[in-house]
From Swiss-Prot:
Protein function: May have a role in the cell cycle.
Organism annotation: Danio rerio
Protein name: Enhancer of rudimentary homolog
InterPro entries in the cross-refs: EHR_sf, ERH
Localization annotation: Nucleus
Assembly notes: Homodimer.
Name of a matching Pfam family: ER
């Protein structure tokens, strides 16, 4: 498990910047999914449930002014930065694994 910091800037306005930290990369990717789900709930307040596909989630990620991760590397005792493309790849792997486990 690698400590992971998620840096989020929803719009071009710098004062909207925020961050969250997680105990692992997977927890962080789940956090990005939850952030999108909260966005969908705000956009559809009267809907009893929400559904989406991965392309919609990726569009949301792409529409953020900035989204990046800092992942702790024990070997160098530093944080390695990663961009949106890396985040989308990790989300894809996470969701594919969850779908495979649900199908068992």
């Amino acid at each position: 498990m690698s400590h992971t910091i998620l840096l989020v800037q929803p719009t071009k306005r710098p004062e909207g910047r925020t961050y969250a930290d997680y105990e692992s990369v997977n927890e962080c990717m789940e956090g990005v999914c939850k952030m999108y789900e909260e966005h969908l709930k705000r956009m559809n307040p009267n809907s009893p449930s929400i559904t989406y596909d991965i392309s919609q989630l990726f569009d949301f990620v792409d529409d953020l002014a900035d989204l990046s991760c800092l992942v702790y590397r024990a070997d160098t005792q530093t944080y390695q930065p990663y961009n949106k493309d890396w985040i989308k790849e990790k989300i894809y792997v996470l969701l594919r694994r969850q779908a495979q486990q649900a199908g068992k």
